């Protein structure tokens, strides 16, 4: 049964306000709340003893969506979930994931998710993932999420991956890996907000193995209060390829940010670029908004929203 709290979590992490269109699997408190397959997208529970599902998308599937959100409303719940995606050739699909935790007590609630993609040739996949946490009024339970995403990208295929950590995650360790074949392209946009005493680590590896493979990473983060962030993207060129890593961060209060981009070329025809910048909000930007009638707090929030948009 979907409660009012569940519905709010689903809207925040997957923009769902009712029953999803197309294939979906809604996981709630380590169980399946609802599941639906379609003619072209089949979702089945794992049979190897692991928690999780297999998603099989038939070759030639175009214009379809698949929603697989996870919500947790219990305190003290910890789970490790494996979801495997098999995307056929010549597909064009959107996959919407994400996890939301409403911690109802003082114990730690934790979701560790391992997503592995096997994407065929000449396909396009848009994958989005939002993470959000909150505590019930008066409660202090920690919210922890550790996502791992592994993508095997076939020839001439494209994956656009958008990841967002909205708020309320006390600790996260992200592990993202791409293995790109000939003519394939990956674009990763990571947006992260930490506050309080939260900690976030993000390790990313993109191997451009095939000729004319392309990779691009855009990381934007904001660290507030005493929070800590470490971002370590690695781009490896093993053939004639192009890769670009861009990391921009805003630091506030007594926060700590480390941005450690790395590029490695194992081929003379690999073209790899990395950029990293960390700074505070410029005073003239705040002043300009304040002259338009915004309070200092409203001006700051407006700038942060635009930066993370």
Predicted segments with their positions:
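C-terminal functional modules
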Residues: 1-26, 30
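Conserved beta-strand/loop scaffold segments within soluble protein domains that form the structured core
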Residues: 25-28, 33-294, 304-309
């Amino acid at each position: 049964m979907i409660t009012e709290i569940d519905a709010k979590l689903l809207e925040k992490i997957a923009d769902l306000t009712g029953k999803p269109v197309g294939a979906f699997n809604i996981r709630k408190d380590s169980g399946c709340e609802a599941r639906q397959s379609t003619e072209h997208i089949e979702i089945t529970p794992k049979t190897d003893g692991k928690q999780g599902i297999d998603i099989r998308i038939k070759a030639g599937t175009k214009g379809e969506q698949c929603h697989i959100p996870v919500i947790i409303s219990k305190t003290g719940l910890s789970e490790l979930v494996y979801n495997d995606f098999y995307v056929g050739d010549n597909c064009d699909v959107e996959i919407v994931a994400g996890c939301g935790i409403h911690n109802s007590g003082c114990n730690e609630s934790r979701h560790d998710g391992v997503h592995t993609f096997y994407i065929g040739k000449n396909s396009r996949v848009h994958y989005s993932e939002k993470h959000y946490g909150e505590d019930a009024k008066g409660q202090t339970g920690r919210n922890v999420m550790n996502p791992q995403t592994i993508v095997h990208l076939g020839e001439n295929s494209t994956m656009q991956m958008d990841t967002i950590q909205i708020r309320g995650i006390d600790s996260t360790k992200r592990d993202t890996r791409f293995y790109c074949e000939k003519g394939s392209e990956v674009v990763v946009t990571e947006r992260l907000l930490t506050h309080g005493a939260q900690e976030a680590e993000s390790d990313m590896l993109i191997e451009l193995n095939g000729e004319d493979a392309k990779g691009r990473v855009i990381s934007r983060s904001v660290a507030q209060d005493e929070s800590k962030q470490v971002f370590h993207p690695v781009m490896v060129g093993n053939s004639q390829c192009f890769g670009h890593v861009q990391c921009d961060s805003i630091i506030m209060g007594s926060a700590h940010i480390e941005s450690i981009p790395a590029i490695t070329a194992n081929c003379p025809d690999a073209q790899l670029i990395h950029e990293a910048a960390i700074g505070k909000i410029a005073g003239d930007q705040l002043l300009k908004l304040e002259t338009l009638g915004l309070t200092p707090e409203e001006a700051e929030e407006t700038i942060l929203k635009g930066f993370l948009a």
